Amino acid sequence: KRFLDLFLTTLGLIVLSPLFLIIYIYIYILDGKNVIIKQNRVGLHGKQFKMYKFRTMKNDSHKQRDDLKELNEHDEVIFKIENDPRIIPGTHFLRNYSLDELPQFFNVLKGEMSIVGPRPLFDEDTKLFNQKYMRRLNVLPGITGLLQINERNTSEFSTWYKYDIEYIENWSLYLDFKII
């Protein structure tokens, strides 16, 4: 799996480098510096790491999270808002097509993530886990996974968990290729 991750990531970075540059310039023009952000996420065995993303929300948007909790349309573990006021106008398409996730290829190179696996969550979200949810931390988190190809916008963490466990229990290189 690691060899596949390294091979596909290297290939992806080479092929997609012009797109990286275009997105970088686009976000810089729209909202200025700090185009690539680092977010604290929880990975394999609960270890924290810095996950890279193209910034599609205004600077310091994470500080507004507590003020917006009443708008959260998801269950207690997932925090997402439809028409989130923190999103930079003009970057919705980056989010809709997961282009904001492209810098995570660097996390894969560092061995913190895999191309396929459960989505890495914020530390504060994993503190809301009950014991059964901790099982999803037994594998490297991924850029994409069963959830993203089946029910990307689901509002229930139990659905996330269902797909994560299905992936963990049925993992094979064939399944990874099917997901990719």
List where the protein language model places each region.
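A hydrophobic, helix-centered structural microdomain
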Residues: 1-62, 173, 178-180
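C-terminal terminal-structure detector
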Residues: 82, 132-180
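A short, structured surface patch at a secondary-structure boundary
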Residues: 77-139, 180
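Cytochrome P450 core scaffold surrounding the K-helix E-X-X-R motif
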Residues: 60-69, 118, 122-124
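Short, solvent-exposed cationic patches
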Residues: 65-83, 170
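Active-site/binding-pocket entry motifs
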Residues: 57-64, 152-156
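Short glycine/proline- and charge-enriched loop/turn segments
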Residues: 69-74, 129-130, 162
